[in-house]
Amino acid sequence: MKSYTLNNGVSIPVLGFGTWKAENGEVAYQAVLEALKAGYRHIDTAAIYKNEESVGRAIRDSGIPRQEIFVTTKLWNTNHSYEEARQAFEQSMEKLDLDYLDLYLIHWPNPKPLRENDAWETRNAEVWRAMEDLYQEGKIRAIGVSNFLPKHLD
């Protein structure tokens, strides 16, 4: 499968299997297993999808070496501080039951609770710092953002 190389040298498959709306349990488990059997090597989930346990179990049960599967999960809107981001990451890793994560994303740039007084900008900077620390600690191979517009990155 074709892949792209990220700025830090990590290779990411261009096509990923998304698990949004895949109900935790047998539905998500079977969906991910079948996607992997069909040749997908990038699995995308998120804390808010509430299916990380099934996604992780399917990855482990697939028989495909972990290093051949690119796994992405995302930080939800309610965890936008340094400590909350680190705790949320650890919770996701516990549910996924994986040794490392390939890509961790801030799911949304401007959560409703943080819109007053542009608090989201400060909070996202804290979250980014936490993600950089997790990256430096070797727990994440790459970090990034999801659903951001150019104005959110200025």
Model-derived segments and spans:
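N-terminal binding-site loop/beta-alpha segment at the start of enzyme catalytic domains
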Residues: 1-69, 130, 136
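Structural preference for beta-strand elements that scaffold enzyme active sites
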Residues: 12-16, 41-42, 68-74, 100-105, ...
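Active-site mouth loops of central-metabolism enzymes
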Residues: 13-26, 74-83, 113-122
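Active-site beta-loop-alpha junctions enriched in small/polar residues
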Residues: 20-22, 46-48, 74-78, 106-109, ...
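Glycine/proline-rich, positively charged
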Residues: 23, 85-154
